[in-house]
């Protein structure tokens, strides 16, 4: 990116100059000069074109850097501040709000000049803020009229407001046209796209007035009135900027949209081939007649449902009940709109799956009719389509927004930097003037200005010599300093030159005349005044306000009062007081959460008294703080204001509780006390700040979103409201909740679409509108525009706010502790002191007993004697192999030097010397550690940091100072630990002996567990340990254990509900279970013996193995109390985590993120608690209803059964839904369903229908209860759940930074693959395929290698794709035959293409990957064509033919090679594959474990809701199908509902397998949190990271494709792959390259400038050419030499046999030689011509003409006249 220079700007009124006749004349003069320059300018020399400055674009606010606009110049024409417009006939106008407007200086409408009074008046009106506010108010009032149902009225009186609005809009347009001109000139009315919108609005508004009744249908035209809401965007400048960002993000979405449409098309074609006509299969009663296929009464229905049973006839499908058979019908599900019978419907179904809207319903329908094996199709669509492509959209929008912000910020920062540097230069000029003898007192205004400390620091931090005094001795004396500064900042030099030209300061030598002195003084004075004004503007309040505050709001009365204040201030600011208040808040929150339905009176009284007590505490806290801090200081902090509001509201609630029931809402506001926790909880504080910052920054975006929602709501109401309303056309007695009959319901439908649910409403709309495609267009448009663009930008801003908040709150990686944390630190220090004292007391005796003997000094690890700390060679090697390096940050381990040991070991004193060894106790606890250097006898140059438990503030004891070894120690290491780790890791050999069994204290007691000496009596035990150690470290042992883990996990699959009916399998599984348990037990014992208990139980992975073995052992017992442990055997697959490196890497990354995730989870719980308490207050006891059957949604009319008592009297059933708001626990579950948009409609319906406690609900009796859920979805769901994404991405990015940018989800082997994918420019020149010698082959070769041939084949592929799309179910046989024939034709064409390519390219055909792919596709297409003839036979199942058909779709994938943008995105996916594979493995493991638990717990659950014959927990396959569905949070409410019923609803007489509902809730909620919120978000984090990497590479001026094309074209000019081409061919080669490497002809002059080296024979090497062309594209930069070295290194790796020739000449030198030769030739020609003329003078002879080449030495013929050109 080229560097851009900005003029130095001073915040001064002189920046603003009125636009006058002189200004216009100056512009015209500049335009004339510019035209003359263009005529005379050399075409070869290209100058960079200037661009408009982003911060000075029209509609933006003028940056404060330019100073305040003079009042007399507001709304007046000014000279443009942007240098880009200096040669444009334009001027700018600023209003009071500093908004920039630009106008053309030419005549508007060819009449009104820029100084015409009428036009000037219109300009002042158009830019005035009152005019904008008037138009905005008009638009708002007009929108209210449009939203009102009465506006549909056709009476004449209803048209009066419409005429008024039209008149206002026309008047606005006239004013703007008179001010700007119409269309001809720059910045005229129609040159602004926003005015196009106004023009269309006016045109569509006027048309009905003039046309009247001449046009039959004006309703569509009237619908365009809704576009008037967009006028608000054209009026409000900030909205234009936001919409501009939206449009730019849409431009960047092109590649993603193309890839998405392409993938959707592929998926749709696959679905069409696999499932065409399959969804019409239903169970038909056997006793129906011949018309059963079209008679719905003959279809078998599901239990308690109106849905028909969908079935299939092959293995894995759902079978029909007795008395019915499975056959195709003429009906498809969902009003016939869900099917794969044609490409259009198939595309819609795949779009539905990709957006995850009710996709589980389609998933279940397909699996019931086609078989469970087609689950893999949905796995691909969900993971590739939904997770990858939709999140690419998020990534693109985020990057577009950040790029725009970055560009604007860069320009502003550059100008501010120049301004600061100019300030510094002027300061130095002042010093220089003083040095030259100018009176210092005249310059003290700058010194006396009231700068802030920050600015004083800035102005006093540097002392550089003046750049203006170029001729002075001072400047010459400091030339080196100036050169250094100039070299560091060449841009500053350039700006200094401009500054010296622009500013009235001209000091070029020591002898300055008085005029120059005066000018210098004036420059300094301007700067001084400016800075003083800035300082004044930053003062918080007016002086009068400050005096008033100090007089009345600062209470300093008498000395006793001051003493009381001081005491209270000490108490109230103490951390313990804050801790006490925090405890009160927590207890108060618990009290609030204890409220529930049907509370007994005693609990009510306790809660009431508790409320009074806490209200009193908070009031007392507020009063005491006001006294201690004074009101002035108390109310300056936002949290104190919030505390006072909460306290006063609580007091009002207590006082007015009995006075008026109308003020009962005050009780709900008590829940705001929970927010007081944010003061002592940084994460909650961060979340609140993020929401606050986002809402503030998103003000404009929120308006845009509101406008979009309003427009679509009104459009839906106008287009569909007449039919798609409350009344259902199919069943008039039932009422519809979601419709567009009025604005409120239309708004709710649009909001529901923005939440992601659009398909069901669209079906109902199409049903009511008789299949109108307009419903599809409008609903999909809302989904795409609203959901994918606006909400994604919302998410981008939220994540950006999160990252900014993290940076602002933690600038240096250090967190500031809250007062509560300080109080807890006091407790921890006290506890630590007591524990330390107790430890020292208990260890004295141990230290005396275990003091080492002198002869054991060489045997101990690092020496235990107080007299010496010398290490022998063996002990150092042991130390090397066992020591773990630690960083200096929080003692976090970097990496162990050996896998076998993590800690230091010794058996010495508890308080061992830090010079001898680190203490284990210090490593086990987070104690302050001191680092010491430990020298190595083998390598004296290496210094190691050893951690000591010694307090860093203490000094080494004098006895230790006497030691010789201690004298060698330094306070800390100067070597980088990472370098030590890398060096030592290469030299340290793996440990081959076991460690001590126990920690040092126990090892001293159990002598057998110490390191055994050769002559020890325990040598046999030692040898046994060494043998066990070698066994467990052997690779075969690990492989065997992995095999056993897989077998034991596989055995769990068969323990399903069918096991009792298979006694032989049950007996075999019991036997194998015992074997596996004994194997794991034996493995554990072997590891105990080999590693010792200390090593084993200090590893988290070993602890996991230990617990699983214990659970397996307990499961073998027959004790009834321990039988429940048998279910925990499902944890056995977790052992795979410690064995598989890929999953281990992901788990380690996840474990490091768990603290942050748990923190956010707790914040979400607290945040949701507020909504839970509000929900309990609003809806507790109101969800019950009186029913007469089993369907809870079919209840009696409230007029017949008004309440619960009447229901029970009438012997009906009073039923409460399982998910309700009766208590906080149930409310959490309800809100989780609302937040995941699963089951939320039933919850909202119950809330909206609620009337009162224990009262029968009525349809939409509480209609505005919807708003509670809307607010929760915005704040509780959107902000908090997306916070998970932000936290996970941010946490993983931090981990990557710690690892030096390496991917944390990949193993070392996978990183090699990743790096191989990322290599750039490493391709070597390959020898092109030689042209055959045979004429026939050569002709075919030229044909297949031509670009025309590729274009024809591409066209055939597209044609084939279109024909495949045209196929449909139920098409006539004649059409089917035509399609079959066309398919055979295409198979023949592609087969012929393959054969002729093989014929032309010979064996080289198979060296290209794409050719191999084409060949495979052709072979499969031939097979599918041959097999399709057997389709009507019953030999093979129909599914086989459907799968074989897919081979035809493979042809379409060949389109990928032609689309570069798609290849970039697929390249990002390929880069993500290793990480995604590891995350997928972890997700599969989680699903596997939960499937086993589900089989154990829920196998006997009664069928109903989401549990049926296929989707259940009876078998492992059914469990996995259910869990895959829940991975996207889809339909988990339907699976949970049957399990929330009582045990009476179990599917078996045995109640053992029926669990409590609480277990089901924990099971599903925990799985959703682990899979949906964490693992899937890890997937998203990886995709975003790799997309950013791929995009950065693709956005570089040169990418991988450019290098590939360079070498491809090089191959044509270098057919023998010599790596050289002739200099004469360079011009053609450079012209043949595509942009940006292309150097178009004529290019000889540019080659001379490149100075290319040439070798013998005028040849150029490919690397020299490539580097020269690269330099031309990227420009000269500091990193170019590094890049050249990297490119050469990569080239040498790819070309080990590179021919190295010493360049003998360069293109520049060659040109010089040629010029010299030409000069010599011309001189020699002239000389010879003179000589010949002299010889021939006076002789007469016949004239002969000889054409010579300049070499006339051989010419000796008389009588010749020579003509030399």
UniProtKB/Swiss-Prot annotation:
Disulfide bridge positions per record: 283-320, 765-775
Cytoplasmic topological segments: 1-126, 180-191, 240-255, 401-570, 630-637, 685-699, 800-1030, 1094-1099, 1141-1159, 1290-1342, 1402-1407, 1464-1478, 1585-1765
I repeats: 115-406
CDD domains noted in UniProt: Na_channel_gate
Impact upon substituting residue 799 to P: Increased voltage-gated sodium channel activity
UniProt intramembrane annotation: 343-367, 743-763, 1225-1246, 1516-1538
Pfam families noted in UniProt: Ion_trans, IQ_SCN5A_C, Na_trans_assoc
Stretches forming II repeats: 557-821
Topology versus the membrane: Multi-pass membrane protein
UniProt GO MF annotations: voltage-gated sodium channel activity
Region span, Disordered: 470-490, 850-869
GO BP terms in the entry: action potential; action potential initiation; acute inflammatory response; artery development; axonogenesis; behavioral response to acetic acid induced pain; behavioral response to formalin induced pain; behavioral response to pain
Sequence ranges of the III repeats: 1023-1320
Tissue expr: Expressed in the dorsal root ganglia (C-fiber neurons), spinal cord, trigeminal ganglia, testis, ovary, uterus and small intestine.
GO CC annotations on file: axon; axonal growth cone; C-fiber; cell body; neuronal cell body; plasma membrane; voltage-gated sodium channel complex
Glycosites: 149, 217, 303, 327, 336, 662, 725, 1188, 1197, 1203, 1211
Alphabetical list of Gene3D superfamilies matching this protein: 1.10.287.70, EF-hand, iswi atpase, Voltage-gated potassium channels. Chain C
Catalytic activity: Na(+)(in) = Na(+)(out)
PANTHER family from the UniProt entry: SODIUM CHANNEL PROTEIN TYPE 11 SUBUNIT ALPHA (PTHR10037:SF210), VOLTAGE-GATED CATION CHANNEL CALCIUM AND SODIUM (PTHR10037)
Function: Sodium channel mediating the voltage-dependent sodium ion permeability of excitable membranes. Assuming opened or closed conformations in response to the voltage difference across the membrane, the protein forms a sodium-selective channel through which sodium ions may pass in accordance with their electrochemical gradient. Involved in membrane depolarization during action potential in nociceptors which function as key relay stations for the electrical transmission of pain signals from the periphery to the central nervous system. Also involved in rapid BDNF-evoked neuronal depolarization.
Written domain comment of the UniProt record: The sequence contains 4 internal repeats, each with 5 hydrophobic segments (S1, S2, S3, S5, S6) and one positively charged segment (S4). Segments S4 are probably the voltage-sensors and are characterized by a series of positively charged amino acids at every third position.
Family, similarity comment: Belongs to the sodium channel (TC 1.A.1.10) family. Nav1.9/SCN11A subfamily.
Protein name from the UniProt record: Sodium channel protein type 11 subunit alpha
Gene: Scn11a
